[in-house]
């Protein structure tokens, strides 16, 4: 689905099914999480990784999954913050001065906590938000096959 059809959501669903099979390598769950994020479904990535983490007894694998789970939570939170910034801008015709302005009716109930113990940093001039602890957003760096006309 990913390479041939460019359908990240179907690819993520298929990969998640494969990751849930007995004996499946944990790398499948990590890839499925990235695909869910790529398909604009970071919440599904969080759910999948939390499930695999809970079912895994190998401590090394659990450590790896915990990092990926936290990265998925960061991605989910960043998208939530970006959406709230867009709603704020649509309502007030300007960007918020700070993230705290996003807490209120129609926006956010509260600001999310950065799971690595850092902060979510906001650049009011550009409207960008990032984690102080995660250098890069979750992306899949692989090129897709070119579609034939």
Where in this protein do the model-derived segments appear?
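Low-complexity, acidic interaction segments enriched in glycine
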Residues: 1-21, 27-149
């Amino acid at each position: 689905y990913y390479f041939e059809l460019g359908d990240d959501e179907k690819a993520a669903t298929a990969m998640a099914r494969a990751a849930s099979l007995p004996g499946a390598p944990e790398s499948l769950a990590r890839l499925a999480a990235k695909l869910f994020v790529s398909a604009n479904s970071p919440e599904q990535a969080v759910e999948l990784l939390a499930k695999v983490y809970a079912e895994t007894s190998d401590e090394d694998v659990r450590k790896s999954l915990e990092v990926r789970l936290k990265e998925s939570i960061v991605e989910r939170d960043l998208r939530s913050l970006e959406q709230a910034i867009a709603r704020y801008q649509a309502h007030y015709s300007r960007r918020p001065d700070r993230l705290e302005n996003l807490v209120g009716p129609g926006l956010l109930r509260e600001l999310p906590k950065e799971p690595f113990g850092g902060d979510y940093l906001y650049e009011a001039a550009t409207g960008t938000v990032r984690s102080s602890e995660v250098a890069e957003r979750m992306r899949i760096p692989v090129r897709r096959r070119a579609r034939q006309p």
